[in-house]
Amino acid sequence: MLRREFLAVVTAAPAAAQTGPFRKLQEVPAAAPLRPDQDRGPLAGRRWRLRWMFDEEKRAASIADFCCPAPGLAVAALQIEGDFRSQPAVVVTRDGGESWRQVELRDNPVSLYALNGAHLWLIGSKSLWYSAENGLEWTKRNLPKSGRKRPVYRVFFLDENRGWAFGAGKVFHQTRDGGATWSPVPESAEIRLTDENTAWTSMAFLDGKRGLITGFSSPQRDEMRLPGWMAPEQALRRRLVPATTVVGETHDGGASWKFSLTSAFGRVVRVRASGHTGLAISRYGENFEFPGEVYALDFRTGGSRPVFRRRDLRVDDAALLEGGAAVLAAIQPSGRLFDSPVPGRLRVFYSTDLNEWAEMKVDYRAEGSAAFLSAPAPGELWAATDSACVLRLV
């Protein structure tokens, strides 16, 4: 695949949603997803059953991130609040959700990355942590020295040694020793963007050589410093302004990177890739007609197309399955604002061809403000919400 096609796949996705004069957009697909009772597909009759939930009277918990490193193994990083203290922890199951073990942490969790059950990393607010014991024991490693104003939000590893750390700021970092030491990716420092306005959001590799990283750069306006739920009328009136979408790509396993910039009204917040295909999840502002949308990516041709866009749903995560199928986890808010602190309803959809979608039955107790998906093995699917709910497809 030519470099210009590789980069065009992702940079075209958010830009295609709304460029130039505003135009009336339609929901995608035009027909509503099939109801669970209408579905006749391969997952018909299966449902998302609650496997773990934090349920205490005097304490509350929120999940920062969730992953499934191996079949039957699920790990949720959470923050427990109550009794005048805050306790970071992970909860782990190694038997498919039949039993769970809680392990206290020494750092507030930000995100997780799992290479497999033997190699698991946790980004904390202060340090990087590593587990070779399914998340049951953690040893301290180092985060890049990027300063408090440029925190690291995520890591990605190709193997137990080679990885990258990224987050706020245009410079991201690389490691060759599993996170013991880090060095800046030199090409990222040369990107012609304002450092304090830039952030990296997602990284994916198609194989051991070809990979991409996505981010954006957008000036922070004064009226955007308050969350929408604190000034809902103002949030709905905000004028949508374009940001700069930035995509980096490598064809040599991260030894070198090249970058492309484009103006877009959306931000790519997550990319999932498998073989020659991928899904990109874009996010828009509160005053936009749609909270976001999902694009299908074809890395062989450089093509992309919208496959899921609904007015009342914000897709947070996606999982690519065998045979070209996909699952989406979305939040339906309780009001008009998607950043409301009031938890919304978890809704899950799947498609075998990315054209027709069917909704799946989800336990009514599953709600939150953010959703996570993980598919550790064929036929095994997990979901979670930040309101401390973990579910498995049964």
Residue ranges and their predicted role:
Residues 5-21:
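N-terminal export signals
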